[in-house]
Amino acid sequence: MNNIRKIHPLVKIINSSLIDLPAPSNISSWWNFGSLLGICLITQILTGLFLAMHYTSDTMTAFSSVTHICRDVNYGWLIRYLHANGASMFFICLFLHVGRGLYYGSYMYLETWNIGILLLFAVMATAFMGYVLPWGQMSFWGATVITNLLSAIPYIGTNLVEWIWGGFSVDKATLTRFFAFHFILPFIVAALAGVHLLFLHETGSNNPSGLNSDTDKIPFHPYYTIKDILGALIMITILSSLVLFSPDMLGDPDNYIPANPLNTPPHIKPEWYFLFAYAILRSIPNKLGGVLALVLSIAILAVIPLLHTAKQRSMMFRPMSQCLFWILVADLLTLTWIGGQPVEHPFVVIGQLASVTYFTLILLIMPITSMIENQLLKW
């Protein structure tokens, strides 16, 4: 009798993706983040579903409904903080996943990489709209500032912003539609993640050496299932510690003040995972220029495969490129720090320098360095 996992139409898809999938024998823990992102997404959808059962998307009751969840619903505080900090874990895993792709040249799988960029944009949009829902001060003003950026688009800008707002300011209509979008987007993200995997399994996984690994494959189960479970346990431990010991560490205290359109907070800033892009936005004095730089700070990932001038795929054997990669990481951490600082000297100048460094490194210095390394190979 044939094994059911190999003949059943549905089960055999799962089998070929998670059990009998041929995987390179040398992939490191940096390849764990795909499965961790899947776990994050499932956690976010489940906790979000339970929150949506008690949340009301009305300006008068949104804030108090979140309070009600935390105070009166059984383990409501746990669900709410798992959801809020789960988003932070999601972005930590996302950034590490993208960083891994950059370091080991995984961006050479073009379809997988481009779907990944789409996923990143979709997750960022979801997180932004989710931050608006508790209707605290930072929710309201964050929504006002970020949506207002669209008014920089020539000719249609103002109409577009008012169309998104559903009025002349961020109000009930805005909150209701953001809740609707925030509810539907994670399912679109899940569908895109399926397509992401579909394209990945067309080519097979990359590996740290960047070489073709067809001659040396091992089955995904049990080798990488057990490895992924270990990664998941570590992530769950970190998330649980964060939720149970310091759930508000990554949040903004201003969001515990109900939204007040008449009172602007001294420093409007988004969640920590958007600060690097926010710093790039603020470092350009022109509104339209800032918006373009903001979009390009993520969209630049799409041109990275075109800028791959090296003869080797991975950075594993390219020490000069490795140095530049870690300078880029340090630069992004600097931008994240600057994004959370007030707009005053010396932070403005540091932000501008870090922004220029970010784009110059990716567009100019790294491709040129790769070409130099190609010449060094001949020695």
Curated annotation (Swiss-Prot):
Cofactor: bound how, per the entry note? Binds 2 heme b groups non-covalently.
Q: Where in the cell is it found?
A: Mitochondrion inner membrane
Q: Which GO terms describe its cellular component?
A: mitochondrial inner membrane; respiratory chain complex III
Q: Print the keywords alphabetically.
A: Electron transport, Heme, Iron, Membrane, Metal-binding, Mitochondrion, Mitochondrion inner membrane, Respiratory chain, Transmembrane, Transmembrane helix, Transport, Ubiquinone
Superkingdom per UniProt: Eukaryota
Q: List the PROSITE patterns hit by this protein, alphabetically.
A: CYTB_CTER (PS51003), CYTB_NTER (PS51002)
Major place of residence: mitochondrion
Q: Where are the transmembrane segments?
A: 33-53, 77-98, 113-133, 178-198, 226-246, 288-308, 320-340, 347-367
Binding positions (heme b b566)? 97, 196
Miscellaneous comment:
Heme 1 (or BL or b562) is low-potential and absorbs at about 562 nm, and heme 2 (or BH or b566) is high-potential and absorbs at about 566 nm.
| Entry protein name | Cytochrome b
Give the organism the record lists: Crocidura wuchihensis
Q: Which gene encodes it?
A: MT-CYB
